Amino acid sequence: MKTIKEQLLSSCKPLDELLGGGFESGVVTQIFGEAGSGKTNICLQLAIECVKKGKKAIFIDTEGLSADRFKQIAGENARKIAQDIIIFEPHSFEEQYSAVRETEKISTENVGVIIVDSATAYYRFELDDEDSSIRTRRELSNQIGFLHSLARKRDIVVVITNQVYSDIKSNSLKPIGGSSLEHISKTIIQLEKTGTGSRRAKIWKHRSRPEGTTCEFTITADGVR
């Protein structure tokens, strides 16, 4: 009998509705889009909402989190909420691997979400030549595969963000990481800029929601709405 997976609400109503009730536990959700499209804002809000529900959040930060932005979204209880967000700040792809492995020990401590923002920031720097590219792709797949296994074993929400590249053939932006990363991610959401503060989220891949379905949301002073 198929069990109903728990979902984590982001408090961005259009996005939660797009995903059929929130971010699903037990799988990896990938969010990709160009710089400034709202990836980190969504991740911060997810971590904050997770803590508000009485659980801890793990946040692997490779982009450089803004403490001011966190305070804006978390509001007057920012200091208290921050106590239940475990932050890793790797400075290389190798350190990112160590942080990912470390989540297994910590995830037993009432953790509701693991976030990697971004999973591919250091990965891009490792793509020097063909041999190292193959090795690095395999390593990225291993990292995200490890998180997928952990998500299933502990029934945790796992969210990774991904950067994009310009695909000349299709004249469109595509996520970095190749087919293996796409395969491991059971839900994939693309974010697009549509105006000042206005964004569109589109489902690229989902187990129960139609691909190509979109929603509009706004980045405001106190989060994504």
Swiss-Prot record:
InterPro entries: AAA+_ATPase, DNA_recomb/repair_Rad51_C, DNA_repair_and_recomb_RadB, P-loop_NTPase, RecA_ATP-bd
GO MF terms, alphabetically ordered: ATP binding; ATP hydrolysis activity; ATP-dependent DNA damage sensor activity; damaged DNA binding
Taxonomy, superkingdom: Archaea
Keywords from the UniProt entry: ATP-binding, DNA damage, DNA recombination, DNA-binding, Nucleotide-binding
CDD domains hit by this protein: archRadB (cd01394)
SMART domains registered for this protein in UniProt: AAA (SM00382)
Keyword DNA damage included in the entry's annotation: yes
Family stated for the protein in its record: Belongs to the eukaryotic RecA-like protein family. RadB subfamily.
Function: Involved in DNA repair and in homologous recombination. May regulate the cleavage reactions of the branch-structured DNA. Has a very weak ATPase activity that is not stimulated by DNA. Binds DNA but does not promote DNA strands exchange.
Protein name as it appears in the record: DNA repair and recombination protein RadB
